[in-house]
């Protein structure tokens, strides 16, 4: 059975994946109205929202997903029928040095949103499970990092892979995933979840792996590579991710989790060398860029391989 969102609250919609989703959805569906709630931390920017298609159908609100009163007001004022929850602290290195903010945003923030939706949809509007299931959606975006790490010969993650998070970041996302599941089974809140592999594409923050490599090359600085660079990631283009999310929102089974991967595994060092070769072609005067590769001490708990 197909579901059609109309008044959508997007959290974290000024960040990398969220802003790409907002732009893509406004361009794809002329009937959708988006309320975009973002705290505008270091990783989000309204610059990511310039020149949106259907800009009159987009309302930006700067605010914190942990602000229960604000979230409740937005749900009521805009008659929100769909929540798409991107907002999260997501940089693993930052979670190692400061895990508290990850627990607050990723766990408490998700709880705040779930509880606000429960109060508005199921209590104030008195929608029973069957009605809520046909007319409301809470979609939660998560990560494949909740599954832990894979060995070289291990099969890729599936939706049945046990959770085994190894960093404060992935542990906080695992906690949020379990809360979403609990609100479905306990209260009948109409939820779906997607767990994605590593994203790349336009608007990605400079601290992330691929932008760091490109920026280091352009500035002639050392390219930091953890350990020996043999760690493997499954890369997913951000717009493909957006399409997958929307497919799940519209056609996914309530209470289910869906993995979205790129089937595109690369060693970190091979990604670095590929970028260096491409920049050698475009900036031959600075070649060879791979002379900038600098192996650095591996980070604690660095998962070796992800694959979906």
Question: What name fits each language-model region?
Answer:
Residues 99, 194, 206-207, 252:
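Active-site loop immediately N-terminal to the catalytic Tyr-X3-Lys motif
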Residues 164-168, 205, 233:
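Conserved acidic
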């Amino acid at each position: 059975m197909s579901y059609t969102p109309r008044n959508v609250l997007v959290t974290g919609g000024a960040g990398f994946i969220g802003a790409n989703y907002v732009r893509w959805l406004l361009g794809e569906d002329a009937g959708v109205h988006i309320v975009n709630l973002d705290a505008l931390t270091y990783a989000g920017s309204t610059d990511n929202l310039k020149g949106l298609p259907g800009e009159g159908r987009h309302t930006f609100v700067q605010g914190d997903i942990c602000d229960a009163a604000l979230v409740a007001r937005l749900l009521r004022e805009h008659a929100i029928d769909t929540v798409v929850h991107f907002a999260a602290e997501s940089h693993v290195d930052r979670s190692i040095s400061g895990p508290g903010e990850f627990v607050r945003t990723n766990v408490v923030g998700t709880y705040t949103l779930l509880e606000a939706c429960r109060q508005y949809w199921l209590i104030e509007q008195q929608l029973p499970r069957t009605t809520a299931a046909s007319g409301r959606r809470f979609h939660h975006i998560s990560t494949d990092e909740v599954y832990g790490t894979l060995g070289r010969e291990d099969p890729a993650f599936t939706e049945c892979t046990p959770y085994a998070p190894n960093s404060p970041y992935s542990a906080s996302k695992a906690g949020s995933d379990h809360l979403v599941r609990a609100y479905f089974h306990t209260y009948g809140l109409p939820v779906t979840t997607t767990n994605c592999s590593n994203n790349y594409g336009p608007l990605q923050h400079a601290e992330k792996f691929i932008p760091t490599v490109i920026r280091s090359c352009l500035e002639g600085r050392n390219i930091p590579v953890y350990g020996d660079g043999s760690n493997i990631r499954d890369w997913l283009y951000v717009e493909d991710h957006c399409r997958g999310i929307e497919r799940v929102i519209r056609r996914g089974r309530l209470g289910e989790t869906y993995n979205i991967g790129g089937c595109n595994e690369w060693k970190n060092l091979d990604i670095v060398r590929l970028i260096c070769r491409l920049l050698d072609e475009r900036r031959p005067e600075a070649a060879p860029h791979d002379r900038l590769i600098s192996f650095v001490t591996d980070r604690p708990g660095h998962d070796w391989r992800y694959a979906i």
